[in-house]
Amino acid sequence: MEWKDCHVERADWLLTPAQRGNPASRVDRRHADGAAWSTGNDVRPLVHGAVYFAELLAAVRAQRAGDMLMFTDWRGDPDELLDGPESAIGDVLCDAARRGVVVKGLVWRSHLDRFQFSEQENYHLGEEIEEAGGECLLDMRVRPGGSHHQKFVVLRHPGRPERDLAFVGGIDLCHSRRDDAAHQGDPLAQPIADAYGSRPPWHDIQLAVRGPAVGDVEATFRERWTDPAPLSRSPRSRLRATLRGEDTRADPLPVQQPDPDPRGPHTVQILRTYPNRLRGYPFAPDGERSIARAYTKSLRRARQLIYLEDQYLWSESAVQPFAQALADHPGLRMIAVLPPLPDQEGRISTPMNLLGRIRALEVLRRAGGDRVAVYSLENHAGTPVYVHAKVCVIDDVWAAVGSDNVNRRSWTHDSELSCAVLDETRDSREPMDPGGLGDGARVFARELRLSLNLEHLDRDGDKEAAALCEPGRAFAAYVDSAAALDAWHDGGRQGPRPSGRLRTYHPPRLSHLTRALTDPLYRVIADPDGRPRSLRRHGAY
């Protein structure tokens, strides 16, 4: 196919307003052209928490009186350092509020701490912000057993819209997240499974978004902020809030500023998950599953390579669109990079966390055989890396980064936020149209994939990157690198360590009895279903 023939049609890859399936949301209705996406954005991937935190710190410190800072979080640790001494996130947000920045936060009011969630940490972060003049609400407006898992920050600057910025992805403002490419871990670490050590290496991604899409991310925040429902219907939580003197009523927000002007070549579609609840959200009465729908649609165009990094990769239903694509197109390959072990360990939690992945990989392998390659990561000391990234790239055209994992919980049950990105800029390197559908490889998607490939393979330079543009060569490079490192470990780690950080992932075996005993816990606790019954019956989203 000639270079001039490569053109990407947004509606081939992105959801239309009707396909989002949630007419109650403002996110699409606010667009004057009626589109379900915004154009003219500049999006940059921030790989690793240390990179993100440094940019976040600089952006917040540059804000002044009258500016706005809005954030959502799953877990927040006020003492987490963003970039060295005197950069604790709680202090940074409080300093902003004292300068006159309008600081508004929505942090999940977690389940009890004995279940290893984050209630006390989130309470203390919110308390500090409130004392400084900001407002941070602990939000439990979720399904039973659910969570608010969205992780984004919006910075607006009335009179200076060129500074407007949103950060969207999978990185919480908490311990363990400030790691870098060396993967030595965050000095302020949250304990997880022993195999990861006292400073768990942590791999994660966030996007920095500038342009009109900032308004769409802000609209998502405003929908949640203005929800008139009480923050919790639990009598126990409400009593505790009263005794503590917590703020339980959201103050009005300033009027939303016009969207920032176009400033780049990226089309961005904001994707969300909200569950179906007994008392529905006013902005999603039956829930929203646009993340699941977006994956289902985009995977139908996959022809050469699906590149995925994910914390879980659970659930037969969630991997079915991947499996269908693999079955339909015998030349399609899939690479998945996952954590080697669950973050929690125990007689109940370990098999509960493994069962969904084992079943998902069985479905994928039946569909794709050895065209499905699954890996974990280790640092150069041999310590496993906890993969918390949530990123997918399809044929170097469509890319998505967000808070969502590939599992039933993220696609139906918790609140999630993701950005799908299509770049107007074609990539000139061969193959120029890897999918063969006329879309043409796109700079953003290809560069995102290559940056991750190069890091995991311990390679750099334009020549190495150009070689990995070809999907088959990238797939083979992962196979060869992991095989060499596996053999070095199996041989007693004699001689120089091979380059690379990839290890072949071998799913553990669970007995039939363990599977049977674990299945109810997995379905109810680990990976519940938040869809309406009618969609469950039809296996649809």
Located regions from the model:
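Charged, low-complexity intrinsically disordered terminal segments
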Residues: 1-541
